[in-house]
Each structure stands twice: as structure tokens, then as C-alpha cells.
């Protein structure tokens, strides 16, 4: 004869069960409902144990985003406060390359630009001033994204170093564009209008709103936002850069065109870095999603430079400008590891030389490819020894 067991569920146990995962179970499913706990016996069946186990596992996983945990770039990194040892050498090299390219707005000579500015046609002055207004505002938007999102999300030290330096360079770009506006535009009201381009110019506002939406989008993945801001720096800037290089081809505005060389080189590096970060992602957005983001950016940039602020104002062909923007988008798609979308050729031969190393005499002016002495060199390259053979 079996002895009577004491109940497994005491009053304390029943109070504990108020917090148990079982409270979340619906009793409508009779097949999976465990026996009543108020009886003198509890059947320790596999089904009952599995219900407790599965619920506990779900509860422990709830606070963690699997996509973040699966991404080495975004995963919590307790060693992020120390630079060495370097783990991502390719990312670190990009940082050192950016560091070697440092420059300041004071190094650009604008003394000859005033005479050229006054000789320009009204349409040309209108175009240049509006492009500068867009640039002055857009660098601030890029920085907003770096400060508010990317620098906080990315846990890899080498990447955080790059983002920190990029923030400094974007500040210098914004200062340079503001200085150009301040130098060329003498009317205080017009100057104020240009400095507030995001609010005063619908064509600039449209581009700014597109970028700002990505900063505030809490649903978009880091990968999608990296593509979006690669499009901002690679596509939204491309047509405007080309239009200023067109002025250089005509021998106009040496200060403006030289600063454009420096800034376009920096933005090219920032875009390359975005592509590098994209390649390091484990879970990348699908190609169709990337194509959607890129084509949206292309459409907005084409509208900006062929309708809202047409490049024909400075004598450029709007159709060729559309093609050039598509060419730049295709190049970005290849950098991201995908197929071309538009499959067009570069219509501007003068833009082919932008990536080539300049041969400018350093003592005449700093070349656009300038890098700070010794930054990219190995320590052994600058050492002095007495062991040479004579």
C-alpha cells in the first residue's frame, strides 16, 4: 500500500507560479494543458517539462536582438576602449589613410576667386551659390548620422576611429562651404537664405529629408542605412562635384575648384569605407533592397540637377549629367558587391582624371592627393642607421 505524498505545490510554490511561464499559457488547448497543480500529484511528463523549458528560453532571448549578436561589427565589445591589438587591419588602414589626408579650410586660397565670381553670368552665380548651400547643409546631416547612429552602434574600435575622424573632416567641409558662401555673397539677406537652405530651398529640402528619414528610421537595419549614406556621399554629391570640376576645366574659380578636389577625395574615401563596412556584415540586405535604395537616390539627384537646379545654367548638358549620375550609381553597386543597374559609360572625360595622382608642384600649392608626411609609412622607412656599405 502506497503512502500518501505531500502536495508538491505548497502555498509558497503557488505564489511563485504566479510569475511562472505557465501563467501565459492558454487553457483552450486541452491537449497541452498540464494537470492541475492543486492535486496531490503532478505528472512530470516530457510535455510539461518542455513547456517550462521552451517558455524560459523564449524569456531569456527576448531582450537580445539576434541580428546584433550575429554581427561582429555591432556585437558588444568590452575591448572597444583600447586600440591595440588591431583586429580589423583593412578598417585600420582606411583610418590611417583618412588621417594622412587631413587639411584645413585656411589652406585654401580664395583671393583670386572674387574677380572670377564677379565676371560670371547671373545663371552661373545662381547655380554655384545653390550648390554650395546644399553642400553646407548636407555635411551637417552626415555628421548627425555619424554621431546619433553609426558611432553608437558600431563596436569595433578601428571603425569608431574612422567615424571619429570623419566627423572632424565633415566639420571642415561644412566650414569650407560656409566660408565660400561668406566670401562670394555680399548681401546679408541672400547669405542668410543660403545658410538656411534646408528650410528655404525645396530642392535642397527634398534631398535633406531623404537622408534625415534614414537617420530616424528605427526599423531599417544597419546594413540598409550604410547603403543609404553611401548613396548620400557617393550619389547625392557626385553631380555637384562634377559641375564644379566643369568650372575647373574652364579655368574658373581656382579656390572653389581646389577645395572641391580635396572634399571630393575625402567623400570618395568615406564612400569606400561605407562599402568596406558593408562587406564585413554577416547579414547583408538583399540585392533587390539595395537596388531600391540606390535607384531612389539616383532619381532624386537627377531631378535636383536637371529640373530644380539644372546644370544647363553653367553650360553643361542635362542628359549627360543624368547619365553620369547613373554611371556613379553603377560604380557604387559594384563596390557593394552587386551587379550594375544602368550599365552606362562615363560621359564626362574630365571626370576620368579625378582618381589619378596629380603632378602639381607641392611648393606652388598643396595637391588634392596630399597626405601628411610619414603617416602612411612604416616606422622602419624613416629610421637612420650606420650600417651601409661604402
UniProtKB/Swiss-Prot annotation:
PTM entry text: Phosphorylation on Ser-20 relieves the inhibitory effect on Wnt signaling. Phosphorylated on Thr-33 by CDK1 and CDK2; predominantly in G2 and M phase.
Reactions it catalyzes: a 2'-deoxyribonucleoside 5'-diphosphate + [thioredoxin]-disulfide + H2O = a ribonucleoside 5'-diphosphate + [thioredoxin]-dithiol
A single cellular component GO annotation: cytosol
Cofactor: Fe cation
Enzyme Commission number(s) of this protein: 1.17.4.1
Ranges in a coiled coil: none
Entry-linked Pfam families: Ribonuc_red_sm
UniProt cross-references to InterPro entries, sorted A to Z: Ferritin-like_SF, RNR-like, RNR_small, RNR_small_AS, RNR_small_fam
Residues carrying Phosphothreonine: 33
Function summary: Provides the precursors necessary for DNA synthesis. Catalyzes the biosynthesis of deoxyribonucleotides from the corresponding ribonucleotides. Inhibits Wnt signaling.
GO biological process per UniProt: 2'-deoxyribonucleotide biosynthetic process; blastocyst development; deoxyribonucleotide biosynthetic process; deoxyribonucleotide metabolic process; positive regulation of G1/S transition of mitotic cell cycle; protein heterotetramerization; ribonucleoside diphosphate metabolic process
Binding site for Fe cation 1: 139, 170, 173, 267
Domain of life (superkingdom): Eukaryota
Cofactor binding note: Binds 2 iron ions per subunit.
Location(s), subcellular: Cytoplasm; Nucleus
List of residues binding Fe cation 2: 170, 233, 267, 270
PTM annotation (Phosphoserine): residues: 20
Stated name of the protein: Ribonucleoside-diphosphate reductase subunit M2
PROSITE patterns: RIBORED_SMALL (PS00368)
UniProt-annotated catalytic positions: 177
Residue ranges annotated as motif Cy: 49-51
Gene Ontology terms, MF aspect: ferric iron binding; identical protein binding; protein homodimerization activity; ribonucleoside-diphosphate reductase activity, thioredoxin disulfide as acceptor
Family, as annotated: Belongs to the ribonucleoside diphosphate reductase small chain family.
EC category: oxidoreductase
Subunit-level organization: Heterodimer of a large and a small subunit. Interacts (via Cy motif and when phosphorylated at Thr-33) with CCNF; the interaction occurs exclusively in G2 and early M.
Amino acid at each position: 500500500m502506497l503512502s500518501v505524498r505531500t502536495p508538491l505545490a505548497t502555498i509558497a510554490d503557488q505564489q511563485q507560479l504566479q510569475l511562472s511561464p505557465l501563467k501565459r499559457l492558454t487553457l483552450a488547448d486541452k491537449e497541452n494543458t498540464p494537470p492541475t497543480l492543486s492535486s496531490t500529484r503532478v505528472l512530470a511528463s516530457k510535455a510539461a517539462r518542455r513547456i517550462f523549458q521552451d517558455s524560459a528560453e523564449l524569456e531569456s532571448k527576448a531582450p537580445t536582438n539576434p541580428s546584433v549578436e550575429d554581427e561582429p561589427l555591432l556585437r558588444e565589445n568590452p575591448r572597444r576602449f583600447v586600440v591595440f591589438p588591431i583586429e580589423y587591419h583593412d578598417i585600420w588602414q582606411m583610418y590611417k589613410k583618412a588621417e594622412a589626408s587631413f587639411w584645413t579650410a585656411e589652406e585654401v586660397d580664395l583671393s583670386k576667386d572674387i574677380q572670377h565670381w564677379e565676371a560670371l553670368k547671373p545663371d552661373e552665380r545662381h547655380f554655384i551659390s545653390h550648390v554650395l548651400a546644399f553642400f553646407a547643409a548636407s555635411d551637417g546631416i552626415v555628421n548627425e548620422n555619424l554621431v546619433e547612429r553609426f558611432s553608437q552602434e558600431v563596436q569595433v574600435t578601428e571603425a569608431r576611429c574612422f567615424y571619429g575622424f570623419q566627423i572632424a573632416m565633415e566639420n571642415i567641409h561644412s566650414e569650407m562651404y560656409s566660408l565660400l558662401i561668406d566670401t562670394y555673397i555680399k548681401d546679408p539677406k541672400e547669405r542668410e537664405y543660403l545658410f538656411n537652405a534646408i528650410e528655404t530651398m525645396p530642392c535642397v529640402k527634398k534631398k535633406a529629408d531623404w537622408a534625415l528619414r534614414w537617420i530616424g528610421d528605427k526599423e531599417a537595419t544597419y546594413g540598409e542605412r550604410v547603403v543609404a549614406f553611401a548613396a548620400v556621399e557617393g550619389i547625392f554629391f557626385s553631380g555637384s562635384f562634377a559641375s564644379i570640376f566643369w568650372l575647373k576645366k574652364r579655368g574658373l574659380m581656382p579656390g572653389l575648384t581646389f577645395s572641391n578636389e580635396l572634399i571630393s577625395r575625402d567623400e570618395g574615401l568615406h564612400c569606400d569605407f561605407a562599402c568596406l563596412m558593408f562587406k564585413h556584415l554577416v547579414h547583408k540586405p538583399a540585392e533587390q533592397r539595395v537596388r531600391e535604395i540606390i535607384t531612389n537616390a539616383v532619381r532624386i539627384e537627377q531631378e535636383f540637377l536637371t529640373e530644380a537646379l539644372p546644370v544647363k545654367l553653367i553650360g553643361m548638358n542635362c542628359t549627360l549629367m543624368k547619365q553620369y549620375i547613373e554611371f556613379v550609381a553603377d560604380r557604387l553597386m559594384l563596390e557593394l558587391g552587386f551587379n550594375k543597374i544602368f550599365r552606362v559609360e562615363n560621359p564626362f572625360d574630365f571626370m576620368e582624371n579625378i582618381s589619378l595622382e596629380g603632378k602639381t608642384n607641392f611648393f606652388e600649392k598643396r595637391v588634392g592627393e596630399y597626405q601628411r608626411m610619414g603617416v602612411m609609412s612604416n616606422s622602419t622607412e624613416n629610421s637612420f642607421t650606420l650600417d651601409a656599405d661604402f
